[in-house]
Amino acid sequence: MKQQTFSDFEYSNRKRKTKREGFLEIMDEIIPWDEWVGIIMPFYPSGKHGRPPKGIELMLRMYLLQIWFNLSDEGTEDAIYDSYAMRKFVGINFLEEDAPDATTLLKFRRLLEQHGLNKLFFDAINRVMVETGHMLKGGTVVDATIINAPPSTKNAEKQCDPEMHQTKKGNEWRFGMKCHIGVDAFSGLVHTIEVTPANVHDIQVTSKLIREDDEVVYGDSGYLGIGETGRDRIRHAPVRHRLSHQPPPEQLAEGIRQFG
């Protein structure tokens, strides 16, 4: 049982609980933490050399916050400091320790990716979200963002990492990778992530972001031409494309009511 803090006692007297806090409490109850920690444990640093690593469950909870709320590494760290609900979910008592920094989260995420655990957990999370009614399906918002990296970045073989590439966005040249995401239009939660070199065009990956039962896809002008080019053959049933549009206001309102 997590130790109660002064903030916990203070917040326990509130008249209402936020939807976000309620959602995180449900996730806290239904996720098999011991089982998931056991999956990661064989791959996690032992701490025999150097500074002792942060606890596996702590890092896993932080990683899940990043996925659910589509946060950057720095944004996740900041959110734990800013949000009582997120701090409570992670289980940090600021009288005893600080939140893990963005670099620590980055290393943890790379460890999961290295051993293929990120997809295992991501798929498991999506199943939990659908089963509990927090992800309704039917509509997806597609988007992409460039993850910058120094041009000198090398891989484990001391060679230029082939997964990183140079691309031009507007009048600016960027180097790194591109993160393509599919977001549930009803809840605002990320359901699919694909990572490519930065020079891969958005529409080349779109088919991987669309779920089998999606009926409508929303995207900005970068996705013009989707469904009309052989490079991106939509694998699923007929899908309506709403480019440069946001989901209907009633859907956005529902997402805000559930997770705002």
Predicted segments, located by residue:
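Charged, often Cys/His-bearing segments associated with DNA-binding zinc-finger transcription factors
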Residues: 1-34
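Polybasic low-complexity intrinsically disordered regions
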Residues: 2, 65, 74, 78-81, ...
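Short amphipathic alpha-helical "interface-anchor" segments enriched in bulky aromatics
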Residues: 36-37, 142, 146, 257-260
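An N-terminal domain-cap segment
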Residues: 37-58
